Structures are given as C-alpha cells and as structure tokens.
C-alpha cells in the first residue's frame, strides 16, 4: 500500500513522521538555507559598514552534506588594524583559538589584516595536525592579501572555526577556497550578509548588525561599527562566547582596545545562555582600522573612550541577543534582571543560575508560571557572598512586554495570589522579563544594595533535544 506519510518543514528542518518504533524525530534533517518567517524580521535589508573593510563568503564543502552553501568567510581590512579578542575558558581550546592567541601576542595587537572563518568543523581536539591546519589557513589569507610572512609564527590573520568537535578539517578544500573568497571581497551589504551566512551552523538566520555614530572629539564625523556572530547551541559563555567579529573604522590604540572589548563582552556575550555549555571555540574579536580618521583613542580616561565603551557595549548586547533569539528549538526570549544586590558580580551569578536551570526553561516552554523553580535556582546559586539572598527580602515578578503592570509572584518572601489567567496571557508572548529583587520589594527598602545583573536566555523545547541528537548527521 502506498504511504500517506506527510512531511513539513519548520525553522529550516524537516519534520519526520513517526517511525515503526513509535518514536517521533521532530526536526532531524536540514532542509535548506531558507529563513523561517518568524526570523525574517531580525535580518537587516541594508547597512552602513566601516570604511576600509572588505568581506566575502564562499563554498568549500567542509561538511560533505553541504553541496552549495557558503562555509568559509573572510573579513579583511585594506590597512593594518589594531585588534583584540576574548577567548573561551574551556580547557580544550581549539586549534584556531590557540593560533589566534599566538597571532595577537606576537604582534601585540597591531598589524592585523583580518579574520578567516570556516563552519562545519570546529578543528577542536585535533592535536598537532589541527594546529598546523589553522596556521595554514592564516598563512593562506596573508598570501592572498599580499602580506606573507617569512616566519610562519608571525602571520597577520586571525582564525576561527565552528562545527563538530574531534574531526580534522578538510584542509585542502578550505585552502583552495580562500583565494576564491578573496577574489569576491566587497564592501556592500550583500557581501556582509553572505559572510554572516558562511559562519552559521545550526543557526536559522545570519546575525549581522551595523551602526553609524559620532564621538565627542569629532561631532561632525561619521564612524561605523559592524558585527556578525553565530551560535544557536553550546552557549553558556565564560570569558567569551560563540564566534563574533566586530569591525570599526574608529582609530583606537591597541592598549585600550582590549579593555573596551572585555567590558562590552562581560555585559553582552558573557550574559547569555541557551544550554549551559561553554564551547571549545568561543572567540569574539574586535578590529579597528582607523579609516574614518579623527583623533586616536589612546587612554581610558578620554571622553571618546567613555562614549565608545557605551556604543560598543550596547552594540554587542544587540548582537548577543540575536543569538538567544535563534536558540536551537527556542520559542521564548527571556530577560532575567536581578536587582538590589550588594554587588554586580553576585547579581550576575544569580541571573546566570536562573538562566541555566532546565526546570525554569522547560516551565517557560510549557507556559507554566511555576515561579517555585525560579526561587529554587536563586537559592542554590553558588559563589555569592553570605547574606546576598535573604528569603524574607526576596521578591519575584513577571514583567509583560506590553508595558502593563508587573505580575507579582512573591513579595518579601510572601507568595502572592497569582492571577493564573493573566500569567498564561503573559507567557503566550515570545518575549518575557523575570524580575528578581533582593532588597525590599514594594516596601521600597533597598536593603542589600543597588547593584543589578542581567542575563538573556531562551526556553528548552522538544526540538532542542532532537536537533542535538542528530547534530553529526
């Protein structure tokens, strides 16, 4: 008898029918690179990009199943850049992480010409051979840009890789593709979007943003900032997260570039969680070529530095939030805000603990206002100062996205009579904010202090398990 089984595509994956064993494999096969309708709104139709940067994406076929989509990206500057990066704290640091660290240390953050990225294979836990592969990628880009070094330890290109851990790169494919990508370098929006696509793995949409701004010393001069990032799973950062490349045409001294990036990352990429895992490859790099001219930012005490710090941090937060919105199988974007803590660090630890809790995440997926799970996570938060969490002073509420009054769940340790119908309506929305107050709640007593910590995270769904169960296929 002819099968009447039906298939449907959701979020770029094909939904499979029940197997003969009665099990359901929800989203097991990548359908194509089409972008889900719900994600289209996050993709820019145009952009204003920093002067002097050229980008491209090209197809190498790093994964054999990828027969046509770009999986190698180049981001190059026409002139040498100042550069800084933050890297994963995972002990098994991937080969590209080690090579990029070496490039920055050898050059002391100067003379950097660009970044080469491949998706489909992480080149992590691949031994000496993997290290040589990463070095060859860097050297190949230098060769294409006309800046080859006689010393293989002194290349000028950073390297990033993302994909399956424990497998060697098909290095010949990548080295053969780098010249093709170089020949396609361009500065237009299409080129930036193609490069952003090339670094994706299980992402359902490319993550790209750009901004134009001014600085106090040059109020009539336009500066630009652009960034791309990738990530949808294995995301819970520690010193960095995912892959991110930020480029600006502001002239910035290498000595202040690192504190600029570290501050921005600590309040953005280090404040998101999808599944609690910290990758072996996490890298966020910032390149500044000074092509827009004006005064060079050389000290952390200058008005330009202060302004740039705010601009970069806000920009990085917007990029990081796109990663959460593309969490594997996610249906919710959740902000957790912990207020009135004695320190920012303790507030962030508590927010992070809530964001990592599988019970909190699954309750939100089920649209269940089970605030006891939030309290439980607050209570077992590790490494915070004694007396930070006092049950009798703790309040929890849901803050709706429509601007209406917060739904109070717990006030000063006392449970509220929760309007379950209103709670259900709030949890129907894609966006939600959880507010935890460690001070005096509605009594207005600030109690322990006024520091705040924020984390962004998503829920856990059936699809997350299936996507990751089938990752290597």
Swiss-Prot record:
Where is substrate bound in this sequence? 201, 230, 241, 328, 468, 473
In Swiss-Prot or TrEMBL terms, this protein is called: Arginine biosynthesis bifunctional protein ArgJ, mitochondrial
Its annotated compartments are: Mitochondrion matrix
What does the UniProt record tell us about how this protein is modified after translation?
The alpha and beta chains are autoproteolytically processed from a single precursor protein within the mitochondrion.
Q: Which reaction does it catalyse?
A: N(2)-acetyl-L-ornithine + L-glutamate = N-acetyl-L-glutamate + L-ornithine; L-glutamate + acetyl-CoA = N-acetyl-L-glutamate + CoA + H(+)
Q: What is its EC number?
A: 2.3.1.35, 2.3.1.1
Instruction: Note the NCBIfam families from the entry.
Output: ArgJ (TIGR00120), PRK05388.1 (NF003802)
Name the species this protein comes from: Blastomyces gilchristii (strain SLH14081)
Site (described: Cleavage): 240-241
Source organism, top-level taxon: Eukaryota
A Gene Ontology term for the protein's cellular component: mitochondrial matrix
At what residues does the UniProt record annotate the site feature described as Involved in the stabilization of negative charge on the oxyanion by the formation of the oxyanion hole? 162-163
What more the UniProt record tells us is: This protein may be expected to contain an N-terminal transit peptide but none has been predicted.
Q: Any idea which GO molecular function terms this record carries? A: glutamate N-acetyltransferase activity; L-glutamate N-acetyltransferase activity
- The UniProt entry lists the main location of this chain as mitochondrion
For this protein, the record's CDD domains field holds: OAT (cd02152)
Q: How does it assemble?
A: Heterodimer of an alpha and a beta chain.
Q: Which UniProt keywords apply?
A: Acyltransferase, Amino-acid biosynthesis, Arginine biosynthesis, Autocatalytic cleavage, Mitochondrion, Multifunctional enzyme, Transferase
An example GO biological process term is: ornithine biosynthetic process
Tell me the protein family, please: Belongs to the ArgJ family.
- Name the active site residues: 241
Q: Does the record bear Nucleotide-binding in its keywords?
A: no
Q: What class of enzyme is it?
A: transferase
* Pathway(s) it belongs to: Amino-acid biosynthesis; L-arginine biosynthesis; L-ornithine and N-acetyl-L-glutamate from L-glutamate and N(2)-acetyl-L-ornithine (cyclic): step 1/1; Amino-acid biosynthesis; L-arginine biosynthesis; N(2)-acetyl-L-ornithine from L-glutamate: step 1/4
Q: Which residues form the signal peptide?
A: none
User: Function, please?
Assistant: Catalyzes two activities which are involved in the cyclic version of arginine biosynthesis: the synthesis of acetylglutamate from glutamate and acetyl-CoA, and of ornithine by transacetylation between acetylornithine and glutamate.
């Amino acid at each position: 008898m002819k099968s009447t089984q039906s298939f449907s595509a959701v979020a770029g994956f094909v939904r499979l029918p029940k197997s003969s064993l009665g099990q359901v494999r929800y989203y097991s096969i990548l359908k194509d690179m089409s972008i889900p309708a719900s994600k289209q709104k996050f993709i820019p139709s145009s952009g204003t990009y920093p002067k002097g940067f050229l980008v491209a994406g090209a197809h190498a076929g790093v994964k054999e199943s990828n027969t046509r989509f770009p999986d190698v990206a180049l981001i190059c500057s026409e002139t040498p850049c100042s550069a800084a990066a933050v890297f994963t704290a995972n002990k098994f640091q991937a080969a590209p992480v080690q090579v990029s660290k070496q490039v920055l240390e050898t050059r002391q953050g100067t003379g950097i010409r660009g970044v080469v990225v491949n998706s489909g294979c992480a080149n992590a836990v691949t031994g000496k051979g993997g290290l040589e592969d990463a070095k060859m990628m860097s050297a190949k880009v230098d060769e294409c840009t006309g800046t080859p070094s006689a010393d293989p330890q002194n290349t000028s290109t950073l390297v990033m890789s993302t994909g399956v851990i424990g497998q060697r790169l098909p290095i010949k494919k990548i080295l053969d593709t780098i010249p093709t990508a170089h020949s396609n370098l361009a500065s237009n929006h299409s080129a930036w979007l193609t490069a952003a696509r090339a670094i994706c793995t299980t992402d359902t949409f490319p993550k790209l943003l750009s901004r134009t701004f001014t600085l106090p010393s040059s109020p009539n001069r336009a500066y630009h900032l652009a960034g791309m990032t990738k990530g949808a799973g294995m995301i819970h950062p520690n010193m960095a997260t995912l892959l991110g490349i930020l480029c600006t045409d502001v002239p910035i001294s290498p000595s202040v570039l690192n504190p600029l990036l570290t501050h921005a990352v600590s309040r953005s990429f280090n404040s998101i969680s999808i599944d609690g895992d910290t990758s072996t490859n996490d890298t966020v790099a910032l390149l500044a070529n000074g092509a827009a001219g004006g005064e060079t930012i050389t000290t952390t005490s200058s008005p330009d530095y202060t302004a740039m710090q705010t601009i970069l941090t806000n920009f990085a937060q917007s990029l990081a939030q796109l990663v959460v919105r593309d969490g594997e199988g996610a249906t919710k974007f959740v902000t957790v805000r912990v207020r009135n803590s004695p320190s920012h660090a303790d507030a962030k630890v508590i927010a992070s603990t809530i964001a990592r809790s599988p019970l909190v995440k699954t309750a939100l997926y089920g649209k269940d206002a089970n605030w006891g799970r939030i309290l439980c996570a607050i209570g077992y938060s590790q490494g915070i100062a004694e007396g930070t969490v006092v049950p009798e002073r703790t309040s929890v509420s849901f803050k709706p996205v429509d601007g209406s009054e917060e739904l109070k769940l717990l006030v000063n340790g006392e449970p509220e009579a929760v309007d379950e119908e209103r709670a259900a309506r709030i949890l129907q929305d894609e966006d939600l904010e959880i507010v935890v107050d460690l001070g005096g709640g509605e009594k207005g007593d600030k109690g322990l202090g006024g520091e705040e910590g924020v984390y962004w995270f998503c829920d856990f769904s059936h699809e997350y398990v299936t996507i990751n169960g089938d990752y290597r296929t």
